[in-house]
Amino acid sequence: MIDYKPVVQKKNLKVIEQREESIYYNKKSEDGGCGGDFKCDTASVSGSVSQRACVYCGARVVLNPITDAYHLVHGPIGCASYTWDIRGSLSSGEEIYRNSFSTDLREKDVIFGGEKKLSAAIDEIVAEKHPKVIFVYSTCIVGVIGDDTDAVCKAAEEKYGIRVIPVKSPGFAGSKSTGYKAACDALMKLMGDKTTDEKIDGINFLGDFNLAGEIWIVTNYLKKFGIDVVAKLTGDSSYDEIMNAPKAKLNIVQCAGSMMYLAKMMEKKFGIPYIKVSFYGVEDTKNSLLKIADILGNEEKVKKAKQFVLEEESKIENELDYYRDRLKGKKAAIFVGGAFKAISLIKQFRNLGMETVMVGTQTGKKDDYEIIESITTEGTVILDDANPYELEKFILEQGADILVGGVKERPLAYKLGIAFCDHNHERKHALSGYVGSLNFAKEIDLTINSPVWDYV
């Protein structure tokens, strides 16, 4: 008989000294906690192998789901590899967003400049595709050689009478969060400076990218009690839809890391108030739906919303009880991009009778970590911008049974011999709303209680 041993033995792993301020054991605020000297939302420590992506990546994942937009990457062809299907975003209409274009800058262009090549690429797209809007992304090399993409885009707009929006996203200018801001700036530029007194009785849904059709789940919920969605930013959205966004009465923001900047700009320019929401998990889905109904609805809409929530919860409660019995007492580790998702995941695990023993994000802010501290138990490891070495250390130290993360974390979990759940934007199954809560419980049960772990 083969003597199976753990894939990785526990060992004394240490973290980089400069990273210690971004790692905190929850002591329930006896020393100031995450509201004290906890360091987050800063540049990554050099050499720490941060899991964050570049500025261009951040801008691209936000803008790419606009279904009828053309995306032109001004840079080497390698940058254009990060294009097709980078999110599992679905469309109810156009599929243009699944195509991508590149100026394919070479050594000669680096020396003599790439503006003429960019202008020619725009000319070709207009001649062959007749676009309504083109987003032009600056990459690292463009930031180095100093091509004036603003001037090229402005000239193209005047020449063709269409929108050509520069996205200032050279990768070395920051991290993925900087790219989010670049994308928000591009969206504001697209919507323009004109204000309007005309309002539509509905909401804009910011920070949902229609992964596996999740935005359709939520919009169908809202329709049940009479709330219309004016524009979706940016999952399953279109140019015409986005141009209507300034007319909405309320912005709801799910992924605050990527879209809070836009929500604040829209409040300042168009007078649209915003609220944070999350449709991950039974608890947050309920709270978000009732909050929206309370703000926008009359007494009848609020009544319908409460009735809808009760009906949906009753449909899945028995099945959730089944999974609670199988998962009770298990320990979870979380490392995701956005803090809103981490907060919802902690609540979901708690609802399933599981304890979160480690939680980290790539883009969390101080107030996000204060919330995380308040809803986790004493001893939970809280960390910002972690690297694989740190994840390994605290997963082993805390005895986690499962890691929830993205594709970059999957190999680490399997090497450590623990279960894994993909909650990133590459996934193809819905985890939002009530149906998503049930799907999540099923997936956690399948991976934690898989017989494969008997052989590890």
Swiss-Prot record:
Molecular-function GO terms, alphabetical? nitrogenase activity
**Signal sequence residues:** none
For the biological process aspect of GO, one term held by this record is: nitrogen fixation
Q: What are the TM regions of this chain, as residue ranges?
A: none
InterPro entries associated with the record: Nase/OxRdtase_comp1, Nase_comp1_CS, NifE, NifE-like
Q: List the disulfide bonds.
A: none
Pathway the protein acts in: Cofactor biosynthesis; Fe-Mo cofactor biosynthesis
Enumerate the SUPFAM superfamilies for this protein: Helical backbone' metal receptor
Q: Which Gene3D superfamilies match?
A: Nitrogenase MoFe cofactor biosynthesis protein NifE, C-terminal (3.40.50.12380), Nitrogenase molybdenum iron protein domain (3.40.50.1980)
Which UniProt keywords are present, listed alphabetically? Nitrogen fixation
User: Could you list the residue ranges forming a coiled coil in this record?
Assistant: none
Family of this protein: Belongs to the NifD/NifK/NifE/NifN family.
Q: What does this protein do?
A: This protein may play a role in the biosynthesis of the prosthetic group of nitrogenase (FeMo cofactor).
Put simply, this protein is called Nitrogenase iron-molybdenum cofactor biosynthesis protein NifE
